[in-house]
From Swiss-Prot:
Gene coding for it: pyrF
Annotated binding of substrate, by residue: 16, 37, 64-73, 128, 190, 199, 219-220
Source species taxonomy: Bacteria, Bacillati, Cyanobacteriota, Cyanophyceae, Synechococcales
The name this protein goes by in its record: Orotidine 5'-phosphate decarboxylase
A GO MF label: orotidine-5'-phosphate decarboxylase activity
Superkingdom in the source lineage: Bacteria
Family: Belongs to the OMP decarboxylase family. Type 1 subfamily.
């Protein structure tokens, strides 16, 4: 594993459960934050203005809206989202290869329209909340999660996407198949002994990086800590070892 010169570049802070004022306060406490993730909660409550605010503060944005619809709708959504200045935009690989290819082209066109660098589209594979049992019982899918993730990552890659989102449990075998330029973004990161909340397939930050994760999505472990700045530094220290 290579030495990590700037570990803060490896951490994407999930701004879930926060409003705009909370976000501003967090960024004041931790000015070293480079990447932030804006998900459904924050985007729906605050709208695109929160993205403009984050860009003004020099933050890189992962717009995690997980688009999943018919191909035309997904493509149009990505066309619009690519004009926000977000570096990463997520969509579900289960939307299918046609939707992913159309979305990728639409994102390039949308960014070009406003003279921005096109974002990398990230394919959501299997959410970290799924367990093997619920996967089989609820969806009637007999494949293992690993098999399914491998297949969906292949769809993402073959569709021209810039990477995918997967749990720490799948990072290692995916990295064996894809170069470092293919982003493997990993949520489900916890510090040892912390509450895993509603996620099931989780791991320690240092281990996820060693296994090949490009970046780690970390939310509540930092944002809900009594000392957010200390926790952020702690995670940076862990992954720089």
């Amino acid at each position: 594993m290579k030495n990590i010169d700037n570990p803060s570049e490896k951490i994407i802070i999930a701004l879930d459960g926060m409003d705009k004022d909370d976000v501003v306060n967090l960024l004041k406490k931790i000015p070293e934050i480079v990447w932030v993730k804006v998900g459904l909660e924050l985007f729906v409550s605050e709208g695109p203005d929160v993205l403009s605010m984050l860009r003004e503060k020099g933050k890189k944005i992962f717009l995690d809206l997980k688009f999943h619809d018919i191909p035309t709708t997904v493509a149009r959504a990505c066309f619009a989202a690519s004009q926000t200045g977000a570096e990463f935009i997520s969509l579900h690989t289960c939307a299918g290869m046609k939707a992913l290819k159309m979305a990728n082209e639409a994102a390039k066109e949308g960014a070009a329209k406003v003279n921005l660098i096109p974002p990398k589209l990230l394919g959501i594979t299997i959410l970290t909340s799924w367990t093997r049992e619920s996967f089989c019982n609820d969806l009637l899918i007999n494949q293992s999660i690993n098999q399914r993730v491998k297949h969906l990552a292949e769809i993402a890659s073959n569709s021209g996407l810039g990477g995918c989102v997967c749990s720490p449990k799948e990072v290692q075998f995916l990295r064996e198949s894809y170069p470092e330029t293919f982003e493997l973004i990993t949520p489900g990161i916890r510090s040892l002994g912390s509450n895993i909340n509603d996620q099931s397939r989780v791991s320690d930050a240092s281990e996820a990086i060693k296994m090949g994760a490009s970046k780690l999505v970390i939310g509540r472990a930092i944002t809900q800590s009594n000392d957010s700045a200390y926790m952020f530094k702690s995670f940076c220290d862990k992954i720089s070892i």
